[in-house]
Structure formats: structure tokens, C-alpha cells
């Protein structure tokens, strides 16, 4: 039967009412924020029921290979690795961040591109202390370590 959704991404179709509706529906987190790479609390929409915001990073999205002909798997991989290296360095220096990848089977999952994702994960696994997880787990972890 599956699992109910715990988070929500409207892409560009959210309104001023989206977060309130998500809170009323019992969602744990919202992703329609493109402002950074650290989760935070929305304590203003419904002050008595804060909502975790897990930012979405459009620049790491594999959709770039679909919409920008100049962004092939080589360029996507180079960008993703540079992004990871910077975020990792900031974490080692005591300022941990998250990096998200928006991935689509119809794009990165194609035979001519999947190698780039495999190479990216080889690069990530070569670094100590990296947590590869879901956005739901990030939201749950954030709520535990930074209670509202």
C-alpha cells in the first residue's frame, strides 16, 4: 500500500496558504524554499505548530541536463562534486550543511547518464562522516537536535 507522504514539494506552485494547509494535514516538513542548505523552522505560519523547512537546491538537480543542452553528465558531475567538496569542507570546519540532489529516473537514470551518478556516489563514499539519507530523515534529525 505504500507510505503516506511526510514532506511536500510544490515546485513553483505553492501559495500563501500552502504551509498552513500542510500543517493542518499533519506534514512534518516543507521543501518549497530555495534559500540555502540548512534546515530551519517556520514558526510564523502557525506559531503553535512550527514546520521544518528543508531547503531544495535547484542547482544540483539533474533537470539541468534536460533543459540546458550545454549541461551534459560530465558538467553535472563536475558541478555536483565541487558543490559536495565545498559543503564537506564547511562541515569539517564546524559549520555542517546539507546537499540535496533532485534526481529523475527519466533523466539521470538513462544509460548515457547513470554513470555520472555512480561516480558522484563513489566520490561521496571516499569522505568520512557523510550521512547519505532521505529528506524525511533530515527533517526528523533536525527536529530532534533543534527542537521547535
Region spans (language model):
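A broad detector of the eukaryotic-type serine/threonine protein kinase catalytic domain
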Residues: 2-6, 103-106
